[in-house]
UniProtKB/Swiss-Prot annotation:
One of its GO terms (cellular component) is cytosol. PANTHER family: PHOSPHOGLUCOMUTASE (ALPHA-D-GLUCOSE-1,6-BISPHOSPHATE-DEPENDENT) (PTHR42946:SF1), PHOSPHOHEXOSE MUTASE (PTHR42946). HAMAP family: GlmM_B. It catalyses: alpha-D-glucosamine 1-phosphate = D-glucosamine 6-phosphate. This is Phosphoglucosamine mutase. Pfam families: PGM_PMM_I (PF02878), PGM_PMM_II (PF02879), PGM_PMM_III (PF02880), PGM_PMM_IV (PF00408). Catalyzes the conversion of glucosamine-6-phosphate to glucosamine-1-phosphate. Belongs to the phosphohexose mutase family. InterPro entries: A-D-PHexomutase_a/b/a-I, A-D-PHexomutase_a/b/a-I/II/III, A-D-PHexomutase_a/b/a-II, A-D-PHexomutase_a/b/a-III, A-D-PHexomutase_C, A-D-PHexomutase_C_sf, A-D-PHexomutase_CS, Alpha-D-phosphohexomutase_SF. CDD domains: GlmM. It comes from Streptococcus equi subsp. zooepidemicus (strain H70). Its EC number is 5.4.2.10. Activated by phosphorylation. The modification Phosphoserine is found at S101.
Length: 450
């Protein structure tokens, strides 16, 4: 991660950290870096979610893009994966999404996509950061016909919706509850599932700029669970603010997280011979029960660091077509280049329809182990070297020995804070408490600051 770019673009409190001035510079410098080798006038697609700060940042970002001669196609409110899809299929030079995903309304972010629909490589982000930190802006300043033009492009939303529908099945007879988080999915999810002939009920469909992700959506599925009870729906589908995540709820009101969703889709593809290298890519946070379920089906897995960015890198490098995270980011590379909540929802409901199974039946093969995570404040200089402390290494080895393969321990540094995270999974809550508390006590005694 660089000075400005984190693992998912540039983020911060809108108008405080992520200011219009910074958005203008990101548009100007980012647009230049991504289009400097174009032989024709470059085109960049820009979209946003429903945050109140979105239009402010959109205006500033677009001004920056126009100032270096880029033609900007303004998509308005659209899901992040919709930008990725349109950039790739319409052969644009780049795409930009203004969103802070599942974060609250006061935050916002700016995320770039290259012409291939993938997030930027580290080298491209560093090139943009170098221009941001330069003492003087030496980029060209065209005038008159050299300036970029702005094109309103509402057709982009319709094209993305039609794409989603083409990947699905006729859902006649399936009753679906949707939670669009008062975010980007609020303009599209209803249309997609109506076009698929589903019987739908929708909440979180009335954004006011401030209520995105506010007690609703994939990080707060409680309201969707209540709606499932009220409507006796077959499945509930909850998206986050920019609709790159999906969390589902089964007909009994139980949460079906990213691990279970990946398993359901992966098993379906594997049985059809369509799972590339019969492998799913996941992160170190995926539950041990997910791994055991894959083993029982003969499906292989590759494990990366936390973050859908690293999952996608692994998939691209080795040619896998399914990966994701426990949090609900699911990447189905046969269709799109980034996590896509609505695409995942369409595939999940298609599998229900084709198999005739309920969501609880499809998810029942994954037994989620109890999990506990404790954050311990440590000095930044020590969080990367904790495993070098003999007492810490010894207690972890001791706990792993007691588990005898029927559990998992993960001790890792936070990527953004002076914290060491201690996580364990085991068959019972009592065992999890024992493993985590024992390790945490040693960590606090050796390097803890509290």
């Amino acid at each position: 991660m660089g000075k400005y770019f984190g693992t998912d673009g540039v983020r911060g409190e809108a108008n405080v950290e992520l200011t219009p001035e910074l958005a203008f510079k990101l548009g100007r410098f980012g647009g230049y870096v991504l289009s400097q080798h174009e032989t024709e006038r470059p085109r960049v697609f820009v979209a946003r979610d429903t945050r109140i700060s979105g239009e402010m940042l959109e205006a500033a970002l677009i001004a920056g893009l126009l100032s270096v001669g880029i033609e900007v196609y303004k998509l308005g409110v659209l899901a992040t994966p919709g930008v990725s899809y349109l950039v790739r299929t319409e052969k644009a030079s780049a795409g930009v999404m203004i969103s802070a995903s599942h974060n609250p309304a006061l935050d916002n972010g700016i995320k770039f996509f290259g012409s291939d629909g993938f997030k930027l490589a580290d080298e491209q982000e560093l090139e943009i950061e170098a221009l941001l930190d330069a003492k003087k802006d030496l980029l060209p300043r065209p005038s008159a016909e050299g300036l970029g033009a702005l094109v309103d492009y509402p057709e982009g939303l319709r094209k993305y919706e039609r794409f989603l529908v083409t990947t699905g099945a006729d859902l006649d007879g399936l009753k679906i509850a949707l939670d669009t988080a008062n975010g980007a999915a609020s303009v599209s999810a209803r249309n997609v599932f109506l076009d698929l002939n589903a019987d739908i009920t929708v909440i979180g469909e009335n954004p006011n700029g401030l209520n995105i992700n506010d007690g609703i959506g994939s990080t707060h599925p409680e309201k969707l669970q209540e709606l499932m009870t009220e409507t006796a729906s077959d499945i509930g589908l909850a998206f986050d603010g920019d609709s790159d995540r999906l969390i589902a709820v089964d007909e009994n009101g139980a949460i079906v997280d990213g691990d279970k969703i990946m398993f359901i889709i992966g098993k379906y593809l594997s049985e059809k011979g369509l799972l590339a290298k019969n492998t799913i890519v996941t992160t170190v946070m995926s539950n041990l029960g997910f791994h055991k379920a894959l083993d029982s089906c003969g499906i292989h897995k590759k494990v990366t660091a936390v973050g859908d960015r690293y999952v996608v890198e692994e998939m691209r490098q080795f040619g896998y077509n399914l990966g994701g995270e426990q949090s609900g980011h699911v990447i189905i590379m046969d269709y799109n280049t980034t996590g896509d909540g609505q695409l995942t929802a369409v595939q999940l409901t298609k599998i229900m329809k084709e198999t005739g199974k309920t969501l609880s039946e499809l998810a029942s093969e994954v037994t989620i182990y109890p999990q506990k995570l404790v954050n311990i404040r440590v000095d930044n200089s020590m969080k990367e070297r904790a495993m070098e402390v003999p007492a810490i290494a010894e207690v972890i080895a001791q706990m792993e020995g007691e588990m005898a393969g029927n559990g998992r321990i993960l001790v890792r540094p936070s990527g953004t804070e002076p914290l060491l995270r201690v996580m364990a999974e085991a068959p019972s809550n009592e065992e999890v408490d024992y493993y985590v508390d024992t390790i945490a006590a040693v960590v606090r005694a050796e390097i803890g600051l509290d």
